[in-house]
């Protein structure tokens, strides 16, 4: 008897071919329902999910098996605060005995070396030619330096990659003694393995979520970056030791050579100070024990090499000098390549977990140490940029892209932590994008040029270039405004420290209220104060102000236009623009001497200056707002000092959003724009005191400017405290 297999009925088969909801019910088989239910057009959500899936699959194919394994994912999911236990990192090191973590980089590097083939003799001669160029820059005279042979090749690529990737060294026995040569070979082999273990530690220490901070990863990253600075200090010492040996062999016998680059600390003292006072040594954290052991292993091999360079006996004649130079370049190339891995891996992705991200003090010190070493040793040691390094390494950049994509797809916006890093990266370096290299004066000039204020917006009614001058002349002929009682106005401004915003020296913008008013006993009498200070005390901040000198002004008077905005308020009446020499001398003698003193902050005051120009002017730090100044006409007011309905807000400037900071919807970064009504006719009558309203509102212009300045001062104070 034939038994029917389960699930082979006609009804079940129909359900496999047609959706069940189209078979059941009274309207089964209606064409419209079948059409809409069977439509399989891709949706935006589906496309994004598929793209993220492909990105994840591609990234997983580039990673070692342990990094994408289920065991690591389960152990990380059980941790809180995006932390990684060090035992998991050690397991990653043990699972990769053949250095699979760097296989893509090694393959690309060997391919590049194969495209530029050089024999051992050619490479040695090219290294010697570059060393003689370097030695001529540090020892300009007093040595019989050999003539530079005709260079037939550029050894930069081989110097950068070959000593690390190829096991065979150019000089295998740089010392006369066989025991010293064996110690040298063992120390170099141990240095290579120890450097690989430290790079593996950095590779496997990444948490699962790059969109959130990680405290222990930040500590480990600080330790690695501080260790990079120690490596370059040791490299400078080794190069100086080799230079001293070469100078003694080439120089006169009765001449004593001193340190070529100043006094350098012995490597043992540098290593001991780092292990005792480094980031991992001062915190007492138990999550950096394996990292400290790996760092100590590398420093131990460097100590052995330094001892050999100090005490080892070398062969005489030309061969001893050649072997000393080539072996020094090979050892330093291994150390330089190892330090480059840590710096470039940090810039490729690990910087998201660093303290202060791109402004991390250890990252800045590490890159600065690398720059100084490569600049001093030029043209011996080339440096690989982070984009070039990432194109060869492949795995780290792809992992970060795949790890950040799901969170971005889920929420539509970056996380607050990652968004803050993107803002910082978009803002550029503190000195501007062009502030690299050159003297201090060149950097100041570039800062002024890069931070020039934007062009003014479209002119408002009654604000032609001639209108401010006519209004000012007419206002000078009017009687002085009546003195307003202190109870009816806000805090009286005084001559305080310059505001923390950049001042364009070609035209003085209107003054903002000072932040720290002076006590009453330090203020001059009302009659002794200049006219501008009296008008500020009366609260007339919305009066028309000029941007430059009058057309009929004399040349000597036009020079005074380049004063800072507070310089006019610091001088008595009769001094400055439009004053006669006699009146200038008389008023200056009557004014207190301390009023002419430089306006530098006291020692206990917060430093608010970037630098000082050659003309004595201050170049101020920037805040995340673009302040666009306008010529604001006086406004009519009702009885009692109230403004007309729908009039412009009581602000002497316009807060325009900086596109580099237009990321979020918070009140701090996206202030509510006030709707400006058409301005009334030009009125030349003196204005009463303006009440300081809207100063404490969450979205008020005064509060936004105060918050921006406070955030800037806190940021600078945190940097100075490190």
Swiss-Prot record:
Q: Does the keyword Cell membrane apply?
A: no
Quote the biased-composition stretches of kind Pro residues, using this chain's numbering.
Answer: 510-522
Alphabetically ordered keywords of this record? Activator, Host cell membrane, Host membrane, Membrane, Transcription, Transcription regulation, Virion, Virion tegument
Topology versus the membrane, per the UniProt entry? Peripheral membrane protein
Q: Which Pfam families match?
A: Herpes_UL46
| Annotated region (Disordered), positions in chain | 423-534
Q: Does the keyword Transcription apply?
A: yes
Return the Low complexity bias intervals.
523-534
| Record PTM | Phosphorylated by host LCK. The phosphorylation seems to be lymphocyte-specific.
Which InterPro entries does its entry note?
Herpes_UL46 (IPR005051)
> What are the GO BP annotations of this UniProt entry?
regulation of DNA-templated transcription
Q: State the family it belongs to.
A: Belongs to the herpesviridae HHV-1 VP11/12 protein family.
- This one is known as Tegument protein UL46
Originating species: Human herpesvirus 2 (strain HG52)
Q: What is the lineage of its organism?
A: Viruses, Duplodnaviria, Heunggongvirae, Peploviricota, Herviviricetes
